[in-house]
Amino acid sequence: TRTDSSAASDVYKRQQLPYPLMNIINGGAHANNGLRIQEFMIRPDRAKSFSEAMRICFVVIKNLSKLIKDKGLSTSVGDEGGFAPMISSNNQALDLIVSAIKKSGFVNGKDVSICLDVAANELYKKNKYSIHSKSYISVDKSIKEYQKIIKKYKIKSIEDPFAENDWLAWNKLMKSIKKVQIVGDDLYVTNLERLKKGFLNISSNSILIKLNQIGTVSETLDVIKFAQTIGYKTIISHRSGDSEDTFIADLAVGTNSNQIKTGSLARSERVAKYNQLIRIEEELGKKARMNKIN
């Protein structure tokens, strides 16, 4: 879809495929288990093609399913297609994912990276957070807990680590950790003015793009263009309640966005986007390239 927006001036010239941020374990508001973090995802960082990225994710998911079953837990899925086992510890979920990556023959943090969507709005009360357990702790203590899991599990991306209006907490986190993708979703809601404020505040280094948050394609393109101009990574995203429409797959390629977040390899409304990206890659043929992560 082309538009006359100034933001669209050259974004269509590139032909690069986004890396998938694939949901593999659901928690928070997307599942009925006790996990505090809403989404546990993987990103196949060394995939040379989108088709290979899908194969890598499939193998990890298959082995994760076996590991969950071996523990006597259910492999039923949550809203976004990831498994929703009845476990209550973030570390338990992360341990399972690390084991699945290793069992698949990949190296965690190199071949495949773990990424999180904390959705901290749901875990915020009176300037404190219950991200890592049911107990509410201060921002500074929460940052220390983030530092621990980043080091232990080689986490490469964290979305919405703090509440949407806790600007100081976001800035503190950005100053405290390096080489981690800090993604604003609720922080920005695909709104150009909030993105400009976040940039001045040094709140994040990446933005999640949801087309229907801002309402029009033109406004969405303006946000993407500005984000890319200031050096932010752009991640095109589905919604937790979605349809089989595949437009965001085309949007991700057309705007040269680094990554796409569209659920797991389950549920037709999620898989449809991945299938469209495979079709795009096939159509591009030898011109097809994967985007850059770093």
Describe every region a protein language model picked out:
Residues 9-10, 54, 82:
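Metal- or metallocofactor-binding catalytic centers and their adjacent structured scaffolds
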Residues 91-294:
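Catalytic core of soluble alpha/beta enzymes
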Residues 1-8, 12:
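Single conserved hydrophobic/aromatic residue that forms the stacking wall/gate
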Residues 15-78:
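Mobile "lid/hinge" segments at catalytic clefts and subdomain interfaces of large enzymes
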Residues 64-68, 72, 82-84, 93, ...:
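Gly/Ser/Thr-enriched, mixed-charge loops and adjacent short helices
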Residues 10-13, 25, 46, 188, ...:
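Acidic, glycine-rich active-site loops and adjacent beta-strand->loop/helix elements
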Residues 19-35, 79-83, 118, 244-247, ...:
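Conserved phosphate/anionic-ligand binding catalytic regions in large, soluble enzymes, centered on
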